Every structure is written in structure tokens, then in C-alpha cells.
Amino acid sequence: TIAFKEPIDSPFLRFEITDALSLDGRSIASIGELDVLVDEAPEERQWQIIEPADTSVSVLQEVILRFAKRALGNDPDQGLIEASLAIAQRSMDQGDPFLTALKAGLKTLLCSPSFLMTPVIDPQDGPSTASTLARILWLSVPDDVLIEMTQRGPLNREDMRGQILRMLQDARSQRMVRSFVGQWLGLDGFDQVTPSLKLYPAYDTLLHHFLPKETEMFMAHLMRENLTIDHLIDSDISFLNQRLARHYGIEGVVGAQMRRVRLDPASHRGGLLTMGSILKMTTDGFESSPIRRGAWVSKQLMGNPLPPPPPSVPTLEPHHGLEASLKEQINQHTQQAACRACHKIIDPYGFGLESFDASGQWRERYRVIQPHSGTFQYRPEGYYQWADPVDASGTLQGQSFRDIQSMKALLRQDLKKVAYHFAKVWFHYASGAEPTLHERIALHAMIPEDPSRLGMADLMTKVLIHVIKDDTR
């Protein structure tokens, strides 16, 4: 019996058989340990709400008021409190259990603009600061430690720095990591593209589940360990399990548990650019799409603003196996003056990632779909044939590169730009607003001339203190 922790929408699941044997006339297949089916929720999400002995209306009011002060600060809107209490009391009057009524009241608070929308931050109001920090870093309410500190008065910069670093270490920060990474890197749209089973028959449900987890765990590790910002471009660590390692061609990782893995330089992996989650979602599921990938690198990592394509120019999706090579097709497209400016910026980044297919695997040659007759039926060998050799070379800002490693080396020369863009993205996430010119100048001043030693948590802390202490919006 296999128990899944969440409903499964797919009518069937495919697991890759890792071992098979015949015993007493029966075939036995092993698919390894399915740790994916175990609830990975942090411990605090597994707490149970216990109904108190006294379930009177007065206790209901006391709990809601205490929660409101913690979630919204010491001085929550009285009208919101009254509305929450009224909904909870009406639920009790209708015969609902105490906990059901309480949840209805608390839901009213959590769905209110006061909680969901970014409030005006008063750095002199300690409880307001506590609520703001918890909302940003935990997507939750402050804990007792934070409340105690802020009740003694406004936090100075050093105290605030200490609290931010402590909160990043807490397991509750994983909610922020998932939300922030989903918005910044586009992982919220990870499920929108699925690699074709004709071209990538080994792509299965387990791999689909673990690919984004690698990225989330990697980013959480950078933040909690305060690793340097250059790990975004290239890194010697990642988080893998056996299924991911097999997909990447990395040996020595056994079991379904995700764990930190030291990457060999020969693995072609390291940093965000070579993660399967990024590589998969920047394709159409068939082709690797250097234009889509290049646009992603340019916008999400480098921070280059991209204007919308001209309305009169048709979309280009280059295909392999045609008379013209992939680069020739793109170069023909960019002969038009209206297209040349943007493609000059984005295409080189995409060319550097051509050694990875639409499922995120390393490749030496392109795959093209092999024509077949009849209705499509899944088969392990797929429906493809090998085509032209991959060309991952290009020119970036006048400097040539031959592959992903040499392109990364060029990107590291622009590390200050990467760090500055990350600061802007984190500011936007924390404040709920794009930085103004004044704020962009302040953010730029936070980046040293040599950002290779700039810690991720250090930069996030500086930006967050600026959001709270220097808020003039």
C-alpha cells in the first residue's frame, strides 16, 4: 500500500524500475525508498490545536484579540476585531464547535488587507516592527523572543540584524524561501511546462517533484549559511537525492532523502543556471529554446529590462533537424532591425545553456522526434533520434565563450550587477513596492566593488533594515 500525502491529479504514475528479479514465479520490482511520500512539513506545522476546557464566548474573544495583537501589532484596527468576533460568534450561535468558530474568526483577520497588504512601517513602534519582520521572513506572526525584544522599545540596527539572522536560521523561514524563490525565479510557473515523453521518456513524477526542491533548498542554504553571492552563478554544492543525481549523471548518491552534495567540476553543474528546474521551465517541453532561456537569465539573474517584442514580428521557435542550424535560424530572425537590439542581449545567454535539453539533462547532440504511426503509447526508449552536435558557444559583451563554464566565468565579471539586482528583487519582495530612485541609489551603495565576498544573509539583512528603518514611502 502506498499512501500519498496530497491528492494526485494524474490518472497514473510512472516509476523507473531500478531492480527486478523473479522469485517463485513472481516478478518483483524495486523502485527504491519513496521518501517523497513522507510528510516533509516542518514540526511546527504538525502541531495540533487543542480545544480549551472553557469554550465560552469570552474565551473566544480573548484568543482572537491576543492573536490579532500578535499578527497585526499592538494596536489592531478595532473595526476588524469586531468583525472577526462577530463572525466567530455567529458560527457558535449556529451550533458549530468552538474550534470551528475560532478558525472562522482567525481566518477573517488573516484575509484582511491589514495582514495581507504591506502596512506603513513605523520603526519607532516595536510591536509593529516585530509583525513586519515575521510577515516578511516567516509569512507568519512573531514569536515570544521577538515580541519580548520589541516590547522594550524600538530595535536598533544591531538588534534588528541579530533578529533577522536568527529568524533566517529558523525552519519557519522556509515559507519565505519558497514564496520568494517562486516569485523571483519564476518557479511558481514550474508546472506549466512538461517535457515531451516522446523525447524525454525518463522524465517521471518523482523527478518533477524533486527538481524545484533542489532550487529551494539551495537558496535556503545560501541564506542560512551566509554563503557568498557568487554561488548564484556557480557553486560547488547542491541538494540532490538518488533520482536527481541519476538525472544529472552524478554517482554516489543513494536514497530518496535530499541532502547536500559536493559537486565535481566535471558534472557540468553548479549555481542556478544549471539546475533542472530552471532549465526545464524555460523551454516549451520539446526544444531547449535559447531565446526563452536567454531572456530568463537576462531578466531574472542579470536584471536587464527587456521591452516587449514588436507586434508586427512573428514569434520564432527554432527547431533542430532543419536545413539551417539553430543559430542560423536565430540569426536570420535577428536580421530585422526591430529584433536585433533585444536578441543581442538575450541570445548569448541562451546559447551558453544549449548543452542542456528540455528536461535539464546534459547532452552532446540534439534529439528530434522520430515519426511514428498510430496512437502514441509510452515506451522507455521514446520516439526520437539523435541529430546535430550541440553548439554552446557564443559572444557576450565582445568576449567569446565556448561552453557553460566559460560563460559562467564571464558572468562572474558582472557579479556586482547580479548582486545589485538581487538586492532590488529582495527589496521589492520585502516592501511590496518597486524601489524608487532614492532607494535604488541606497541599494547600489550596499554592494562593494568586489562583491565576491558579500554574504547572502548579510545583503538581505542590510536591505531589510533599510526597508524598516529608512521607510519614507
What do these predicted regions represent?
Residues T1-D54:
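Aromatic, loop-rich ligand-recognition surfaces of beta-strand-rich domains
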Residues E44-H428, R440-R473:
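Active-site substrate-binding loop specific to GH73 endo-beta-N-acetylglucosaminidase modules
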